[in-house]
Amino acid sequence: MSDISVEKLTELEAAAELERLARAIAHHDELYHAKDRPEISDAAYDALKRRNEAIEAHFPALVRDDSPSRRVGAAPALATFAPVVHARPMLSLDNAFSDEDVRDFVGSVYRFLGQLPDDSIAFTAEPKIDGLSMSIRYENGILVSGATRGDGTTGENVTANIRTIAEIPNRLPAGAPAVVEVRGEVYMAKSDFLTLNAQMAAEGKQTYVNPRNTAAGSLRQLDAKVTASRKLRFFAYAWGEMSDMPADTQLGMVEVFRQWGFPVNPLMKRFNSVDGLLAHYRAIGMERPTLDYDIDGVVYKVDRLDLQTRLGFRSRSPRWAIAHKFPAEQALTILRGIDIQVGRTGALTPVARLEPITVGGVVVTNATLHNEDYIKGIGQKGEPIREGRDIRIGDSVIVQRAGDVIPQIVDVVLEEGKKRGEPYQFPHVCPACGSHAVREEGEAVRRCTGGLICPAQAVERIRHFVSRNAFDIEGLGEKQVEFFFNAEDPALCIRSPADIFTLKKRQENSLTKLQNIEGFGATSVKKLYDAIDARREIALHRFLFGLGIRHVGEVNAKRLARAYLSYAAFEKAALEAVPPKEGDRTDKGSEAWQDMLAVEGIGSIVAEAVVDFYGEPHNREVLAALLAEVTPLDEEARVATGSPVEGKTVVFTGSLERMSRDEAKAMAERHGAKTAGSVSKKTDLVVAGPGAGSKLAKATELGIEVINEDDWFKLVGED
């Protein structure tokens, strides 16, 4: 779904994508901030956050309580250092990736303050140090604590380790405010990093990946002596709680820090124009290779503190500052091969195998190739990229590394007189299971259709199968599914949906008893078996949703169930629409295909996904095994209800006090109405409870009838 443009997402798809992004970004935040071992590049991480923000902007009603746009970093690692609550939150900065982004930032500052862009507002520009953010607190001039940023609100108490850094003073000069929090970046110099790695190699120990991770890991040592041996350094550039402000500008505050004995960056300067900021950005970029510390951009800040106060903050970042990121580092190497990886959603992703090359101090052997169009030299909108040059095995390629882990191939260097290899043929068969891999119109990604049988997708498919709106099997959460899937004992393993329903029988004939395994017990095992048995008969729409057919979400599953009424009829139609000729997507001339297209709300994309699924023999085998254990119940035929809301589209918003949101949907459908998650011109009625916000405002704007919850009950005759 991540390859679908935001504008094409349905509300259900957008909600699912926001949930996926929230989990993914939280996972990578924890790896980066709490465990110091990132899995993806900075650019890939930024792309996740930008997509999250774009979806939230397009679907503001779907913004989650746990949205990444509402938090910073990750909570500190547990059972290591005591937590410290920051007196003032340590927020992250928004990013700029182009000159235009910087001009937009400066323009937004002028617009917010209601001033014309006449260069009257000064900005500072300083290198963005690639280290670990730190807050150091002094009371009455004495260092009392040092804390990491953590999640921005709570960090880790690393005071003992901070005291070992020679560049951080233990006392402030006389005259300093009673309470001072100096903030900055702990880092390891490149020269010290190389010396440390040489020492580790000489001792036969594993060397470190880069200075940033090494500095973070060194600062989190439980033994302060280890930290002291690592020669960590510090740059001061910001502050937290201050009982008195010794200066009224950003530049003035940093100068005060210098006078107090803190190292400050000598490349920090003040400018009154965007052109000045951008010129300094390029100058720092030119000087970057000669610096003895890693930087990944330049930070711009409004210089006057009174203007910073007026500008204030967004939920997780200040309006008065932005980080202008540098482009990724690049190197030239040879493409030795292309492997295909299958993701948990069935997406086939090409991975380049490279002649080893050092990029930014790290040896790179693999790189992402994104998708088959990217290999062909075609961009996301069909435009030529790399001047239309395709990528072939044996080519000289430019590798770009935009962070700590995942590099990418950005260009091909054609050598005159050198014969190239054959154009790469992207596989149309899944390498993990042998099922067909199809690419839907308008999408960049080719996906495996083996759904229920593909080992690369199995865990995710089973999690979906047992989820709340599918089979809803209590006791089979994410951890339990992972446990059963990875179990090697045949009496315990669950690799397909049918395995869930044979678990009890397999256990009866096994010496390995589930109740004897840690995390389970006799009571919980009985409850699990009871929950499984309770789903041996299941509503047709839940059964269809549980199969995990692409594009058949909860709404479309209900549409199909209502149209076909029985599983036998649905399966017959799907199989009759399967093309007799291999390679065709669907038998578009068949009556079954035309009937499926005629189902209200089901278009060709959904119908083709259904036919692709049933066209795979592997899927049919798994379904046969499942149907031997489970009976999908026939859907009751819809009859005219005579209800005043029959055929209408209803939106529920705000807090409902007499029913849950699911009960409200069920009641509306029982009376022949359709429910929607957003208000549009097609909405007939809005039921608004306390706290109704944007949906209520939109309904009022469009002149749509709005009633409260009590009036709803009266309207449908269930008061």
UniProtKB/Swiss-Prot annotation:
Its EC number is 6.5.1.2. GO terms for molecular function: DNA ligase (NAD+) activity; metal ion binding. The keyword Zinc applies. NAD(+) binds at residues 42-46, 92-93, 126, 149, 185, 301, 325. Residues 640-719 form the BRCT domain. Its cofactor is Mg(2+); Mn(2+). Keywords: DNA damage, DNA repair, DNA replication, Ligase, Magnesium, Manganese, Metal-binding, NAD, Zinc. Disulfide bonds: none annotated. GO terms for biological process: DNA repair; DNA replication. Zn(2+) binds at residues 430, 433, 448, 454. DNA ligase that catalyzes the formation of phosphodiester linkages between 5'-phosphoryl and 3'-hydroxyl groups in double-stranded DNA using NAD as a coenzyme and as the energy source for the reaction. It is essential for DNA replication and repair of damaged DNA. PANTHER family: CHROMOSOME TRANSMISSION FIDELITY FACTOR 18 (PTHR23389), DNA LIGASE (PTHR23389:SF9). This is DNA ligase. It comes from Brucella melitensis biotype 2 (strain ATCC 23457). The lineage of its organism: Bacteria, Pseudomonadati, Pseudomonadota, Alphaproteobacteria, Hyphomicrobiales. The gene is ligA.
